[in-house]
C-alpha cells in the first residue's frame, strides 16, 4: 500500500469537512471524545502540549485514532476552508472522504 501524500490527506480533510460531519476546535473535540463520539481526531503539529496530552488521554480511553497533521493550526484551518486557526478536529462522519484510511506516522 502506498503512503498517502500530504495533498491526498489535505483533500480528504476538506472533503470530510464539506460532505461529512466534523467538529472543529479542541474543546468541542474533547467534549465529543469524552462521550464516545467520533471516528478520528486530527491535530495540528503546533497544538499546545497540554491540549495534546488531554486529547491523547481521552482518545486512548475511547480507542479513537489520532492523526498528527504536519501543518500549523493556521494551515489546518485553511485546509478546512475556515478563516481561523484549527488546532484539532474530530471526524464524526467522513461523508464522501477516505480520511479514515489515513495512517499516522507517529
From Swiss-Prot:
SUPFAM superfamilies: L30e-like. GO terms for cellular component: cytosolic large ribosomal subunit. Keywords: Ribonucleoprotein, Ribosomal protein. One of its GO terms (biological process) is translation. PROSITE patterns: RIBOSOMAL_L30E_1 (PS00709), RIBOSOMAL_L30E_2 (PS00993). The keyword Coiled coil does not apply. InterPro entries: Ribosomal_eL30, Ribosomal_eL30-like, Ribosomal_eL30-like_sf, Ribosomal_eL30_CS, Ribosomal_eL8/eL30/eS12/Gad45. Pfam families: Ribosomal_L7Ae. GO terms for molecular function: RNA binding; structural constituent of ribosome. Belongs to the eukaryotic ribosomal protein eL30 family. This is Large ribosomal subunit protein eL30. It comes from Methanococcus maripaludis (strain C6 / ATCC BAA-1332).
Amino acid at each position: 500500500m502506498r503512503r498517502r501524500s500530504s495533498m491526498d490527506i489535505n483533500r480528504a480533510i476538506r472533503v470530510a469537512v464539506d460532505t461529512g460531519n466534523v467538529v472543529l476546535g479542541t474543546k468541542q473535540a474533547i467534549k465529543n471524545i469524552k462521550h464516545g463520539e467520533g471516528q478520528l481526531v486530527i491535530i495540528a503539529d503546533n497544538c499546545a502540549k497540554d491540549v495534546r496530552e488531554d486529547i491523547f488521554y481521552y482518545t486512548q480511553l475511547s480507542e479513537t485514532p489520532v492523526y498528527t497533521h504536519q501543518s500549523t493550526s493556521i494551515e489546518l484551518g485553511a485546509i478546512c476552508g475556515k478563516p481561523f486557526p484549527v488546532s484539532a478536529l474530530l471526524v464524526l462522519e467522513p461523508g464522501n472522504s477516505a480520511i479514515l484510511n489515513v495512517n499516522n506516522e507517529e
